[in-house]
Amino acid sequence: MAALIAENFRFLSLFFKSKDVMIFNGLVALGTVGSQELFTVVAFHCPCSPARNYLYGLAAIGVPALALFLIGVILNNHTWNLVAECQYRRTKNCSAAPNFLLLSSIVGRAAVAPVTWSVISLLRGEAYVCALSEFVNPHSLMVGERSFPVAHATEILARFPCGEGPANLSVFREEVSRRLKYESQLFGWLLIGVVAILVFLTKCLKHYCSPLSYRQEAYWAQYRANEDQLFQRTAEVHSRVLAANNVRRFFGFVALDKDDEELVAKFPVEGTQPRLQWNAITGVYLYRENQGLPLYSRLHKWAQGVVGNGMTPDHVEMSLLPS
């Protein structure tokens, strides 16, 4: 049963790795929507106090969005490739345009969750109403022939998000809520439209500027996914066998289960890779060609024995970043 569950998880992992990044972004967005709903129900409580409402409302929208953005940057492998590039090569082998494109890719992916959070917050309107209720102009509030009392208007308006205030002003409370939710939802829909246009233009520009055909880009994406999967799996086995060998040398024996015994017997490990090899396969990578043949990754480049960035006429570097 455990093996079946593990196999199913492996299949799902391979499925999502083989598909377009839009699937992953969709899952991130759905998870963010659920988190936002839970936050609104459990944790959001407007203080309904002048000066505090504004800070609390902005914090309810901005702080989780900022946290989600930073988490997205941290979890993106391209971030650490860029850091490694700066550390080992000082980005001297990459022009400004590729570095900017890679940074844009990192920011774009990391922005999925915070943008989703902001959009849902604006469409719901609670945080916006909480933040701006006290700033509604009391002179603009008219219901029939009744006008809103100006005395202590700020304090009364600040209490409206909590459903509080004088009973005879409940009709104004509904008007304030309706007006602010209209503004909040309008900003939310505008944000959706702006993001959709930016995504569309970015995708069009990426494919227009790409030197590769659509099929070769798809093949490159499949290669990267397969290389990463095989590298991680092999690194896990290599480190496990190496650890078993070192423990055996120290104690004279090593306690292995059946699976580990098969691994040690099947994959003998003689040594480790030097640091220079690890550095060679780590960092920012652009699509390159060597004598007309594509090099799809730093590992591919290292395996082919290509040294440097290939700036001779027989080498072609293309400023195309992975999706």
From Swiss-Prot:
Listed InterPro entries: CALHM
Catalytic activity: ATP(in) = ATP(out)
Top-level taxon in the UniProt lineage: Eukaryota
Extracellular side: 44-52, 133-179
Bilayer topology annotation: Multi-pass membrane protein
Record flagged with keyword Translocase: no
GO BP of this protein: ATP export; calcium ion import; positive regulation of apoptotic process; regulation of microglial cell activation; regulation of synaptic plasticity
Compartment(s): Cell membrane
Family, similarity comment: Belongs to the CALHM family.
Subunit structure: Homo-undecamer. Two undecameric hemichannels can assemble in a head-to-head manner to form a gap junction.
Protein name: Calcium homeostasis modulator protein 2
Originating organism: Bos taurus (Bovine)
Gene: CALHM2
